[in-house]
């Protein structure tokens, strides 16, 4: 059974500068299986469908965010960082061996949208207790040096389907739910 956090959508102190609009370029490394190009396009489409001031486009080189193969020894599905200097974090490491290639436009797209979310400043909705989505012992990521700011207008009630929960079950699809849409709209 999955439990969820008691407060939901969070962002970092630093965000991507968008002004009146900004398009972020994303590249999928050729070291990743072809299914990841499909998944990248699906993740980008999820964001662009929200009509935000931040938009995304897939490119083959010169990207602001590169989706790259994680080391074979990686013990995570994927890992991104947080924005600095008004720019997105520049890399997401993806453990394609652990994720596989099935369900690129749902499961894999959810993972990529989640990591892109980190790159533009979204925290785990259950950062205060990862056991809500991951199980196991209580694990608080804390505000760290990047901040954990509750996004206005998002609920303090449980929301088990956010795209920014820390963990995801194999094969699950988490498109943006209504609370995610509010968070995206408030921030971007």
Regions found by a protein language model. Give the residues of each.
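Short pre-active-site segment immediately N-terminal to the catalytic Zn-binding motif
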Residues: 94-113
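Sec-exported extracytoplasmic/periplasmic mature domains
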Residues: 45-53, 117-125, 169, 185-188
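The catalytic-center signature of Zn2+-dependent metalloproteases
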Residues: 106, 113-174
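A short alpha-helix/helix-coil micro-patch that ends at or immediately precedes a cysteine
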Residues: 26, 31-58
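Disordered inhibitory propeptide/activation segment of secreted metzincin zinc metalloprotease zymogens
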Residues: 1-35, 144-156
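Acidic helix-start/capping segments at beta-turn-to-alpha-helix junctions
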Residues: 25-30, 57-75, 134-136
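Surface-exposed patches in mature extracellular/periplasmic domains of secreted proteins
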Residues: 49-63, 124-131
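Catalytic zinc-binding patch centered on the HExxH motif and its immediate surroundings
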Residues: 36, 66-91
